Amino acid sequence: MSLSPRLYTQVSRLPRELLTACSITLATRSFSVLHRPAPNYPGHVPLTSIERGGLAVGSAVMAFFNPYRADLIAACGEATATPYFIYRLRDAMLSSPTGRRILRDRPRISSKTLSMPRLRALPPNTVGRCYAEWLDREGVSPDTRDSVKYIDDEECAYVMQRYRECHDFYHAITGLPIVREGEVALKAFEFANTLLPMTGLSMFAVMSLKPAERRRFFTIYAPWAFANGLKAEEVINVYWEEQLERSVEELREELGIEKPLDLRDIRRMEKERKKAQKAT
């Protein structure tokens, strides 16, 4: 079926990950872009149920084969969070005085809202210093998080955005690196704590790990992730901007999070052991 010039123009403006993930849907039914409801907030892309399902399946499959495509992971997270899970997370924030303040204030986390030089100058062992050092060590920036597009409720869209922008703080206080093994461990913790389906689906990436990494995940990091994720306070309710000068150990204790074994040290010692074996 050929597209009229007007319809082609409308379709071409849709986000790339939606067009890619929903290619089967587009091939089997008339695309309803001309009748799409008005967006509920800037950047919002309303989806039908079929489009949402196509986006969820397509982005999940492609993200499994290319886990470094952050846009696909973000799209999968949004498509699978509704209708129930993102509302549960929003309600968890509404049930907390701090969560309600976050929803009222709508803070954003980026290099524009956080002064990285100031964080680097904070005393050692503070949350802000720990966060800045983790970003520097891993070579990442707080400005890399995609904006939410596919969640219809404007308040829930902010909840997803907040979760997304706080992800690096979870890395920082647990010490888990951004290597695939560390990401899988953190996603397991997030799943136990937030119940967002995308975090659970991300654990299938354990199948792509090396045998030694899989053993470490199942014997060390999965037990840590589920035990701590279930017993810890809801991490979505942490007002990180107000915790920057606190002791990171004190905050972990308050949240009920035990720091896992240092994955970078384990990987380094494993590499040295293999190197020594080859030398002999």
From Swiss-Prot:
One of its GO terms (cellular component) is extrinsic component of mitochondrial inner membrane. The gene is coq4. Its EC number is 4.1.1.130. This is Ubiquinone biosynthesis protein coq4, mitochondrial. Zn(2+) binds at H167, D168, H171, E183. The keyword Amino-acid biosynthesis does not apply. Pathway: Cofactor biosynthesis; ubiquinone biosynthesis. It is a peripheral membrane protein. InterPro entries: Coq4 (IPR007715), Coq4_euk (IPR027540). GO terms for biological process: ubiquinone biosynthetic process. Residues 1-31 form a transit peptide. Pfam families: Coq4. It is found in: Mitochondrion inner membrane. Lyase that catalyzes the C1-decarboxylation of 4-hydroxy-3-methoxy-5-(all-trans-polyprenyl)benzoic acid into 2-methoxy-6-(all-trans-polyprenyl)phenol during ubiquinone biosynthesis. It comes from Botryotinia fuckeliana (strain B05.10). Belongs to the COQ4 family. Its cofactor is Zn(2+). It catalyses: a 4-hydroxy-3-methoxy-5-(all-trans-polyprenyl)benzoate + H(+) = a 2-methoxy-6-(all-trans-polyprenyl)phenol + CO2. Keywords: Lyase, Membrane, Metal-binding, Mitochondrion, Mitochondrion inner membrane, Transit peptide, Ubiquinone biosynthesis, Zinc.
